[in-house]
Amino acid sequence: MATGLFIGGSLLTLPTVQAKNTVSDDYPLNDSINWNLSPVWRDEFNGTSLDSKSWNIYASGWGANNVQSCYSRSEENVNVKNGSLNLVGLYKPGARCKGNEKSGNFTSGFVETKGKKSWTYGYIEARIKMPNNKSTWPGFWMSPDKPTYGSWPRSGEIDIVETKGSNLNYAAADAHWGLSTGNKKHAQGRDLPAGFKDTTQWHTYGVKWTEGKLEYYID
């Protein structure tokens, strides 16, 4: 299964995203010197617009999980400035979009690599500053480029990080799989490392994906 990246949220900012092949798998988290990684793709967002060879801007509603925003292509919602990708949520009374009957009053940004960049196994990370606005739910996650084993959740989902604007000490990692939405399974972790500063500060969130195993990292 090859997966691509999906990034959505309100005032979520990323200065870099990268994918790497893992050369060595035997070192502890704090032994950064011996982590031998060979980047296969990265985006530093150094220009003034999103790289269309790597990214799509998703523009529509999102019907799941009570999301109440319309994702927009507008530059005020998705822009690249000063070495960062900015996904911005805005109060827009009366906003409506297809795919989400609950949408209204808010617009936001959502980008994905679907159909352009995908990987099977390796290490994926991004440096992200999250919002602190109430009811925001930004995320950095991976979903199959093609539904090899069937529709969600059969083909899986890897959530590298999801946060809540109402709780700046919350950062969840997750994975979903199963035969149906009524029989889906997931594994979720919320324990944050000692000394972790709130999610509105810059942090690097990553996942190391090997056959039969997912390891999640913060900083």
Which ranges hold each PLM region?
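GH16 jelly-roll
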Residues: 20-219
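Sec-dependent N-terminal signal peptides
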Residues: 1-5
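Sec-dependent signal peptide cleavage junction
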Residues: 7-24
